[in-house]
Amino acid sequence: MKDNTQVFESYSVPRAVRTLALPSMMGMLVNIVYNLADTFFVGQTGNANMVAAVSVTMPLFLLFIACGNLFGVGGCAFVSRSLGEGKTERVKTISSFCVYSAIGVGLVMTVLFLVFRKPVLYAVGASDATFAYAADYLKYVAIGSPFIVSSVMLGNLVRGEGAARVSMIGSIIGQVVNIVLDPIFILNKGDKLFGLTMPFGTGQGVAGAAIATVIGNVVSVVFFLIYFLRGKSILSISPGRYRVRGGIARGVITVGLPAAINSLLMSISNMLINVFLQAYGDNAVAAMGITMKANMLVVMLQLGLAQGVQPLVGYCYGANKLDRMRHSIRFSCVCNIVLGTVITVIYFIFTRQVVSVFIDDPAVIDYGVKMLRALMISGPVIGCMFVLNFSFQGMGKGTQSMILSLSRQGLIYFPLLIIMNKTVGLDGIIWSQAVADLVCTAMSVVMFLLVVRKLRRQHSQKTEA
């Protein structure tokens, strides 16, 4: 069994953050490509209804991701805290709970989506023209649901014991397999791709995209299982260690639920902003879609760094090494602020060129330039909020994490979007996310200072006793 906890215990803070964050950030970069792959390759068929079908089913796919985050992010935080407390037996119970709960939830979702496929798809926006394609996509993705949920869960869970590199490799392997298989299953033999003729292809269209996605996740799960079976991990996949009581389920779900809700709210907020933008024409909708893709680079990189440092915070909190924990959080915030500032400056200088990468329509580009600059206003500081939110998760502070998750994409953002649209119009829609991000960043700093003050008071009371 390999001891990965030395990165938490003995590495300097900069080295520990680098060791944990870089693999997570690399995984996020590949994830950006992965998120665009299905839409890109389905788009090569020239069938707009197939492309629309993939978009329609995206909220349902994000539901699988949310369930994976429920057990993965929650399990990661609970595992790292338990390791810091020296409770290795509890770590094995936590990991077993997460593994088999994820499989169970995945199986339930398989049954539900296969049985209620038609009403579910029409509820999320399928039309008569797109239903058949969306139904094909959902059928295969639903069958693979246990693997999709488990892949997301395992990629997060192993980070809890410091195996950031293993998490990165397992996730990237699955994503690369998906990207490689996409054109093979989607396109026909003889179709053109990047100016070249496809030497083979099954021509299954949108169903092929779903099959490639499932196979990629199966490969990822197999990789993690091999990691466990080779005795490289302190985590356990033994069904005999599965427990719900003893604070196990509560400890996982308290932290995992905010992460799951955040995934769902991101999907809902994207749908809502498109509904508002429809009043201003298709060019505005297209420009916002492009802006979101461009903004994905800074958000994913900053999320990757924040996600990487979460188990370090959890371990230090569990081991009562509060000075090291605060140092780790401060250093990570500074790194994200520098990263966000650099990318923001580059985007402001080359805004038109960035938007033009995605489209050559002048009207859409004009909208996109305005939208990207507005969205990037929060770029330098939003990474600080990500670090603090993941730090709350690492410390097991589910309430604070829940407040931030609900606020950024819900409680603050939705009212702002509605009010600013009514009072300012299109500019209000464009600026609403940046304003919400700035407000939530300020909230996260205040909440963190309150948590630190409480921890100091508790520590001084223990010292006096």
Where are these regions (language model features)?
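Short alpha-helical transmembrane segments in multi-pass integral membrane proteins
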Residues: 1-21, 79-146, 193-257, 313-378, ...
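Transmembrane helical elements of multi-pass membrane transporters/channels
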Residues: 19-38, 140, 174, 216-220, ...
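Generic alpha-helical transmembrane segments of integral inner-membrane proteins
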Residues: 25, 29, 33, 37, ...
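Hydrophobic/aromatic residues within transmembrane alpha-helices of membrane transport systems
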Residues: 26, 38-42, 54, 79, ...
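Helix-terminus/linker motif at the lipid-water interface of multi-pass membrane proteins
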Residues: 29, 33-51, 121-128, 184-189, ...
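Interfacial/gating helices of multi-pass transporter permease domains
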Residues: 42-62, 128-136, 206-207, 248-255, ...
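Small-residue-rich hydrophobic transmembrane alpha-helices
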Residues: 51-111, 148-167, 287-351, 382-404
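Short runs within selected transmembrane alpha-helices of multi-pass transporters and secretion channels
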Residues: 141-159, 167-175, 209-222, 306, ...
